[in-house]
């Protein structure tokens, strides 16, 4: 099963998925997003991919700013779909990527991280947003 955490670059999940042998796709969109319009933008940017893989039926949501919510969403996907192998592509936010990595570390028996290596465009983003701090140690110690 392929689980892409969707961002704004609609070609990336398709490219990663093309390298895999996954028939079922359960995409995750950040909701709420860092800005109100971001979830709708992410879905719009990935619309052709979601149509192509029938991804709307298994579409899930996890807060863009919370790695622990992504972790819980991945655990829920595993339970709901009785998944024995997840290929997770952290293509969304950095906190979502952290949640994906925590899940893969905890569930290394079924989860793996798959990632592309995009070429960064010039003048893409400016400035620095809010800094988020996460107590990962307590989360890991609770395992």
Task: Tell where the protein language model's regions lie, with residue ranges.
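Gly/Ser/Thr-rich loops at beta-strand to alpha-helix junctions
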Residues: 4-14, 33-34, 89-98, 120-121
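A polyampholytic, Gly/Pro-enriched intrinsically disordered region
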Residues: 46-54, 131-143
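Redox- and metal-dependent alpha/beta enzyme cores, enriched for Fe-S-associated oxidoreductases
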Residues: 5-77
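Short Gly/Thr/Asp-enriched flexible loops that form oxyanion-binding sites at enzyme active sites
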Residues: 96-107
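Extended, well-folded catalytic/binding cores that form a central cleft or groove in large enzyme
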Residues: 58-61, 77-78, 84-85, 103, ...
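Short, flexible loop segments at boundaries between secondary-structure elements
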Residues: 108-140
